Swiss-Prot record:
This protein's name: Pyrimidine/purine nucleoside phosphorylase
Function: Catalyzes the phosphorolysis of diverse nucleosides, yielding D-ribose 1-phosphate and the respective free bases. Can use uridine, adenosine, guanosine, cytidine, thymidine, inosine and xanthosine as substrates. Also catalyzes the reverse reactions.
GO MF: guanosine phosphorylase activity; purine-nucleoside phosphorylase activity; thymidine phosphorylase activity; uridine phosphorylase activity
Stated family: Belongs to the nucleoside phosphorylase PpnP family.
Segments passing through the bilayer: none
Listed NCBIfam families: PRK10579.1
GO cellular component: cytosol
One Pfam family matching this protein: Ppnp
SUPFAM superfamilies assigned: RmlC-like cupins
Domain of life per record: Bacteria
Length: 95
């Protein structure tokens, strides 16, 4: 079953799904802007197109991730994103 999500007045949209091969995940697109997300479960985020500048809890500073690159966000935390151009991502929810 697909679950459609919309955040930040439509600037971020995603489709959640369950996959036999990767488990619970979502794929989405973010318009240019700055965003703060909170997590319930640990997350593995992979950039598909564009780039994401990310501030992860416990990190020493902002890091840029480009297509094919992955970052991890701990459970029960917040992380900040700066998006310079429309960008897409795959988010896997880890257990």
């Amino acid at each position: 079953m697909l679950k459609f999500n919309e955040y930040f007045t439509g600037k971020v949209k995603s489709i959640g799904f369950d996959s036999d091969s990767i488990g619970q995940a979502s794929v989405g697109v973010m318009e240019k802007g700055e965003y703060t997300f909170s997590t319930a479960k640990p997350e593995e985020m992979t950039v598909i197109t564009g780039s994401l500048k990310v501030l992860i809890p416990g990190s020493s500073g902002w890091e840029v991730f480009n297509p094919g690159e992955t970052f991890y966000v701990p459970a029960n935390s917040e992380f900040n994103l700066q998006v310079a151009e429309a960008s897409s991502y795959l988010c896997k929810y880890l257990s």
